[in-house]
C-alpha cells in the first residue's frame, strides 16, 4: 500500500510540473487498452493548419460556436490530436476526467 501512495504522489507531482500530462483517478479502458493518464503535450506542436482543420470538422458535424475549443466536442478534438487517440476515446471517460481535459485544452489555447 505505501508503494501505491508513493506512485500516486509522484503522478500528482508530475501533473503539477507538466499540466499537459493528466493522471486519471481510476484506470480507464478504451478499446481493450487500459490508460492511467493522458499526455496532451502534443498541443505544443499543433499549428494553424490543425486549428483550421479541427474547426472545419466541427462545423461539418453541426457544432456552432464562436470559440470551438470551448465546446466539449472542440476540446476533445484538440485533445485527441494532441494525445494521438481517436476522439471517441473521450465519449465514455468519467465526467470529472473529461472536464479536466477540457479545461486543460482551453487554458493552453487561451494562455
Stretch-by-stretch model annotation:
Residues 2-111:
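Short, surface-exposed, charged amphipathic helix/loop patches that serve as local interaction elements
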